[in-house]
Every structure is written in C-alpha cells, then in structure tokens.
C-alpha cells in the first residue's frame, strides 16, 4: 500500500488530502496542487481526471514545489499507485511502428537513447518486464510517460504526440 499527501500551497501548506491508492478524480479534494509528500510507494500523477494529460512519476520524498516533479502547472487531477515489481526489467524499443525495424533491448536505465540506439525517434516498444518511465529529452527531462507491461504499437499509445524519445528509466520503488 502507498501513501501520498497533496497540498494546495507550496512548502506543504494549505488544505491537504491524503491518498493511499488510485484515484481517477481528485477535484473534489483540492483545487490546485503545489506540493506533495510521498511517504510510501511510487506514484504517477496526471494533470487531468481519468488518468489523462501530462504525467509525472514520483518516488518517495518531499516535493515542496510542482517544478520539482517537472510540473508545468499546479493542476493534478488524478493519480495511480505504481504496482510493486520484484524481478527483472526488460523493454524493447523499435525504429518503426508495430514493433518492426531495428530493435534494441534494455534492462537498465538509459540517460540518452540516441547514444545507444543511434536514433532519436522510437515509434513503438514492448515492455516485457517491470514498469518504465519514458522522457522526451535526455537525462530524464521533459514530458514523462509511464508504461506498464505490454506492447505499444505506436508512440501515441503511450500518450506521446511525437516519436521523440530522449531517455527512460525503470520505475523502481525506493526501499
């Protein structure tokens, strides 16, 4: 089980709401979110209800300002607890849609896709084991996309507007 507390104001001030599991609509509990305290588990926060919009992956820790989780606004409208995963991590990325063309398999974090894959565009991927977070820019910057195990036949299936992929990492929970 996880525990996350949302605060309307920066530095853990103002009205707060404590959550211990997935919530598709947080609007009834707070009008804005400027800071977050993750006490246990890892979480994906979404800017819109029903797990839509920009995504933000947060591990255990304190985030006194939404910019600390690379947020672009104080809007958080839904959240998911990342299931605990014990075991290996494996993901394959492909240069073409439908898991075709050049393929490369990863089992570790990758701070620069271009350095390993020699391309900046990834049009499809297959998450074989574990949960992963993709980033638009190198060094885990830019828009984030949380991926569960499964086949993503085109970049739009993981929520991306373009096929540009800069980096990715395993969604590993802190001990």
Curated annotation (Swiss-Prot):
SUPFAM superfamilies given in the database record: gamma-Crystallin-like
UniProt GO BP: lens development in camera-type eye; visual perception
Domain of life according to the entry: Eukaryota
Pfam families: Crystall
Domain Beta/gamma crystallin 'Greek key': 2-40, 41-83, 89-129, 130-172
Subunit structure: Monomer.
Family classification: Belongs to the beta/gamma-crystallin family.
Stated name of the protein: Gamma-crystallin B
Gene behind the chain: CRYGB
